[in-house]
Amino acid sequence: MSPKTRTSKSHKSTAGGKKLKGLTDPELEAMKDRIKEVKAGNADGESAVLAKIAEMREPDRSMAKRIHAIIQTSAPALSARTWYGMPAYAKDDKVVCFFKAGAKFKARYATLGFSDKANLDEGAMWPTDFALKELTAAAEARITALVKKAVS
């Protein structure tokens, strides 16, 4: 048998030296971010979100800034916080929606997602994640409507 080598799909965890199989480097980084968020508690979520947005590469950064502004305007009851190292927006401390930068996960698009706490139900099936390549006026209007519905 050949010795195992460390790849992006096999990481040593910090607890007990066990290997975490099936996680990419960005996924492992997101998990570490989440652990830091839980330990930090609900410190200044707005500042944390703005800092994470500032770290993003274009076009993710511009989209995240605009989505942040749309959410603040259309759903002021939501509070900004980070979630797995990405901007998220919560109601009663439960994440309702979040932005996921495409570059971080080597995806060809960013994502605006909604958790099961969002009121988006439409019959037996409905979308919860939306791919974003750019923010047009039509896309911004749809995001505004989705966010308002999610918190209704």
Question: What are the residue ranges of the model-derived segments?
Answer:
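Charge-dense, helix-prone N-terminal extensions
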Residues: M1-S152
